[in-house]
Amino acid sequence: MHVVVSGAGIVGASCALELVRDGHRVTILEPATPGGRQSASYGHGCWISPASVVPMSMPGLWRQVPGYLFDPQGPLVIRWGHLPRLAPWLFRFMMAGATVGRVERTAAALASILADSPGRHQALSSEVGCGELIRQDGLLYAYPDRPAFEAEALSWRLRRMTGLTWRELDRAGLEAREPGLSDVYRFGVLVEEGAYCRDPGRYVSAIVAHAVALGARLVPARATGFAFDGSRLAAVETDGGPIPCDRAVIASGIRSKALAVAAGDPVPLEAERGYHAVMEDGSAGPLHPVMPSDGRMANTPTADGLRLSGQVELASIDAPPNWRRADILVDHARKTYPGLPGGSEAVRDRWMGHRPSTPDGLPVIGPASRSSDIVHAFGHGHVGFASGPITGRIVADLVAGASPLRDVTPFAAGRFAFGRV
């Protein structure tokens, strides 16, 4: 079969590679450079964590939303001008985390695509010739004290429920692992099975290049819709003309929303904008990835320097970046690691990108309503990078008509059908 994959981020690249491995003729549509700055995969926080099963929306969050609207320094901000359009999504977002039962179901679904993510990335990176980019050195969550950790009891209970294990560190343990960490932090949780990527852009580029070497074709075009012959897919429409095909995969990140509508599924997908800053001299920073509890940010040593990633900004996809969000990350990092250099010249790069996010925190994976010849693979939010390889395998199974490696029922687009919350 001829399969057209729309998008060459980590999810699209993984889908294309699995499909070409299975013997399909594969065309990858990507208007920009695979692994380039336009992709959420490029600027992602680099973590590959089985601990990322905790949804953004949790019980009691609704009480905090008004505060987010007025706190310019907080980890989550909503642009006022976007609020009217965002309101339906925001309502569903709060309802998704309204009860413990709901977040337990979400965590279980996320665990199904995250549990073995470090091993999958190690195998994939080795296959595509850049195994040195994936390191499984553990991921550290740093807290001021044990009570601060215990205040997140539900989050850690969800992680324990999904099979995660960790090791607790006191101040001496923190100092041994991270000598540069401020003495404000006196308690830590080390997820030893966690991994990270030292250069996400190069990694994604290598996956696409490997797929092309195996026979896939990379076309610099953007998918704009579909042509059908009855219930069957006839072609993918692009800004360069139609491409006849038998199957199609929607993996275009935030741009997937319009394609999903064309495939019969009006999915509530919003741009959850994230930022990162890179400090070239991170020698006084973390030796391994660290997430300080008060900053809600990933501090990760990478090939380019110390990457400081985080922030959630809900705004229009076309709104200009607010670089103050990146500056907040730098300011916090300098408090977390007092030895980091000061001054604007210490920051070598700033980036903003769009996490494609659904209100319930789960991706959309599975056949489209208009035609089962189209398979959705988008909306992964914060877990797209970690779950990219397994999503690719699931999609290849669905295209082949085989039983998928994981149950895709929780990820079906139909969960957003009219009348469902």
Each model region followed by its residue ranges:
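Glycine-rich FAD pyrophosphate-binding loop
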Residues: 21-42
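Rossmann-like flavin
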Residues: 87-209
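A conserved short coil-to-beta-strand element within the FAD-binding core of flavoproteins
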Residues: 169-178, 219-234
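C-terminal catalytic lobe of FAD-dependent flavoproteins
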Residues: 166, 294, 335-421
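N-terminal Rossmann-like FAD-binding beta1-loop-alpha1 element of flavoenzymes
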Residues: 2-28
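Active-site substrate-recognition segment that forms the wall
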Residues: 44-47, 52-96, 225-233, 241-372
